[in-house]
Amino acid sequence: MSLCEDMLLCNYRKCRIKLSGYAWVTACSHIFCDQHGSGEFSRSPAICPACNSTLSGKLDIVRTELSPSEEYKAMVLAGLRPEIVLDISSRALAFWTYQVHQERLYQEYNFSKAEGHLKQMEKIYTQQIQSKDVELTSMKGEVTSMKKVLEEYKKKFSDISEKLMERNRQYQKLQGLYDSLRLRNITIANHEGTLEPSMIAQSGVLGFPLGNNSKFPLDNTPVRNRGDGDGDFQFRPFFAGSPTAPEPSNSFFSFVSPSRELEQQQVSSRAFKVKRI
């Protein structure tokens, strides 16, 4: 890059803009924009904002036009001896070269600082990446172990589900058996309930009394009078079975079970038939 392609920048630290129009040039080889130059050099004594040098001379601070007109260029150095013109030109070129060099040093400093910061951040990020890689490896191991545990739990769940289904089938089977037995018992109970009243009614028809104090009736079956020979019948008392024990005097009613009552009826009926024969 040639010197002509470089642009002078304001030497104020917080400004750093490209100069155009008017600028303030100091004897300490610094240059400032019109805004900051007029603001900083309005005080007395003037202090250079870049190097803190005291600028007390009359020509230590000059406000100059960066793009002078053709008339100014034709007249500013007119009448001066060549060595004076060359001296002025050499000093102006030295100022320009110093500004470009300082700007490059400043940019190199910023670049070096940024590069150091970048390396530091790269180192930090490298350490973080390594730490994250270790964590990732650890987490992958945990995920693998958790997958194994999950497979074991799935297997256990499958086994337990099969056992539960088998238990449910057994339960349904037992429930069906229980329901069938219950219905069977209910049917038998209803059938016995319909038979018992009919048996009780038949005992009443045959003339047998109910209760513990009931006694078998006397058999009044007529038999022929063998002594008289007149063909008449006479009644002879006959017990079909042994009379029951007398009922205690302190009970008013006494009931026997249907099975006991049925047994008594069967015995009386057999005795009656034998007597008839």
Curated annotation (Swiss-Prot):
Ubiquitinated; autoubiquitinated. Keywords: Chromosome, Coiled coil, Meiosis, Metal-binding, Nucleus, Phosphoprotein, Transferase, Ubl conjugation, Ubl conjugation pathway, Zinc, Zinc-finger. One of its GO terms (biological process) is blastocyst formation. Its EC number is 2.3.2.27. GO terms for molecular function: identical protein binding; ubiquitin protein ligase activity; zinc ion binding. Ubiquitin E3 ligase that acts as a limiting factor for crossing-over during meiosis: required during zygonema to limit the colocalization of RNF212 with MutS-gamma-associated recombination sites and thereby establish early differentiation of crossover and non-crossover sites. Later, it is directed by MutL-gamma to stably accumulate at designated crossover sites. Probably promotes the dissociation of RNF212 and MutS-gamma to allow the progression of recombination and the implementation of the final steps of crossing over. PANTHER family: E3 UBIQUITIN-PROTEIN LIGASE CCNB1IP1. This is E3 ubiquitin-protein ligase CCNB1IP1. It comes from Homo sapiens (Human).
